[in-house]
Amino acid sequence: MSFLRRHISLFRSQKQLIDVFAPVSPNLELAEIHRRVIEDQGPALLFHNVIGSSFPVLTNLFGTKHRVDQLFSQAPDNLIARVAHLISSTPKLSSLWKSRDLLKRISSLGLKKARFRRFPFVSMSSVNLDHLPLLTSWPEDGGAFLTLPLVYTESPTLTTPNLGMYRVQRFNQNTMGLHFQIQKGGGMHLYEAEQKKQNLPVSVFLSGNPFLTLSAIAPLPENVSELLFATFLQGAKLLYKKTNDHPHPLLYDAEFILVGESPAGKRRPEGPFGDHFGYYSLQHDFPEFHCHKIYHRKDAIYPATVVGKPYQEDFYIGNKLQEYLSPLFPLVMPGVRRLKSYGESGFHALTAAVVKERYWRESLTTALRILGEGQLSLTKFLMVTDQEVPLDRFSVVLETILERLQPDRDLIIFSETANDTLDYTGPSLNKGSKGIFMGIGKAIRDLPHGYQGGKIHGVQDIAPFCRGCLVLETSLEDRCIKSLLHHPDLKSWPLIILADNLRETIQSEKDFLWRTFTRCAPANDLHALHSHFATHRPNYNFPFVIDALMKPSYPKEVEVDPSTKQKVSERWHAYFPNKETFYI
């Protein structure tokens, strides 16, 4: 029995998976059912009757921390920590003996050719992507998408592989759009191929193996294979077969395999797509994928997910990945003690780190090191402190930094930097800025707890998010940032956040992170008075004002359309006739 089917049986027995037999449309309806269930911390869903396809669809497999922990039970949480300790320790025979299980895992790295195992796939007689139950998740999506694709490519110069998760849009029966990004492996491989005027072979796996999914999103160094990482975590090699008409290994752990190529120089409008930032990423030209063959298991199950505002499945699997990788950060970046990127902000928008300060401004050196490390280089706001704070409580992190931050030296802004493709707060696609907030050493100020001032012109409501951070409800028409910077009632507050809706912004840490850091760019939206320039930098003064209002150039928030909302509400008991515990 495959890994996926074992866990389907396990979760079904634990009432952590529900079979849905009612007919369900993959166009908006299925995604809305999924969203309601995951919001209520509900079970995984196996849809057996998806309109227009003979294949069942599995969603919400990663929808709770409990299920994620079970899915990765083969790889204990301390696995990477033990490897990091072994690498950084003086080698001793006794320690090697105690770590012999790790050596066994290392012997399991890589792929294994399935010489005697039956090939578990059948090939479609003709390529027709319409037979697959691709989801349209949001009303303004540009079409139907693969939402859990594992896209495999190899460098045409070094043959090093990459397994990445890039969304894939269906254009017609044999053509798709590849949302490759230049700063990630697949995009780099296509760039290399195009320099040689070659087409790039591409394989797309749809797999129920969670270790492949986790590895595909892992921010590994360019020369580290995601497949090797997956086999280390699962403690077993990946079986594969090669065919004469395609250069890539066909992984036995897949449910579907799409093989083809990305033609050199071919681009096509892709999107819009409601993404994991909670907004629509807009239509842009991206590479094409020409599908030449489709393989699938005879009893194939189509894995899918739905992304949007937090919390969705990407949040839980992203946090699991950080649990695994966190012991490696001090090994790769010796100045880092702990580091966390916040899934509530889409991960790349906000990162916080506890660092060492063993010499003058080592913390700055470490901050720059973080911003130069792989996918961490896409970080937009970086919060740095040398205090032992719980990074999973952002309000405590922010208070710790604001107690220590010296405005004339501890705010550093970099303009004209690379930006996450999905983040539209910069001047144009892939362009943005970065901001570093540093709070090092002993506290130098007491932070205000509550607002004691009067009404402020153009401000509808005022309340603190935490000590030292005040949120002001205003609008693009009413805001006057210059007057706020000079307002006497705000002088004691180090940080001011401008928000469209105060109560929704401060109702939870999740909402504060999402509404603040996905709606601003350091260079454009962080404002502060500066008394003078010295040594090629401005000397800032408090308060810092972050304008987190929705701007006209930003994409819209993803929202369910009324007809889909009504349809799902009316049909709820058809999906779940036994009235499960999650809400309607």
From Swiss-Prot:
Q: Matching Pfam families, A to Z?
A: UbiD (PF01977), UbiD_C (PF20696), UbiD_N (PF20695)
Q: Which SUPFAM superfamilies match?
A: FMN-binding split barrel, UbiD C-terminal domain-like
Going by the UniProt record, its keywords in alphabetical order are:
Decarboxylase, Lyase
Q: What is the annotated temperature dependence of this protein's activity?
A: Optimum temperature is 30 degrees Celsius. It loses above 50% decarboxylase activity at 40 degrees Celsius for 5 minutes, and above 25% enzyme activity remains after incubation at 50 degrees Celsius for 5 minutes.
**Comment on pH dependence:** Optimum pH is 7.5.
How does its activity get regulated? The enzyme activity is enhanced by Mg(2+), Fe(2+), Mn(2+) and Ca(2+). No stimulation is observed with Cu(2+) and Zn(2+).
EC no. given is 4.1.1.61
Q: Give Gene Ontology CC terms.
A: cytoplasm
- Provide any one GO MF term from the record: 4-hydroxybenzoate decarboxylase activity
Catalytic function, reaction form: 4-hydroxybenzoate + H(+) = phenol + CO2
| Enzyme class (EC, first level) | lyase
The protein's superkingdom reads Bacteria
Q: Which family does it belong to?
A: Belongs to the UbiD family.
Summarize the protein's role. Catalyzes the reversible decarboxylation of 4-hydroxybenzoate.
Q: What's the subunit arrangement here?
A: Component of the decarboxylase complex composed of the subunits B and C (Potential). The subunit D usually found in other organisms seems to be absent.
Descriptive protein name:
4-hydroxybenzoate decarboxylase subunit C
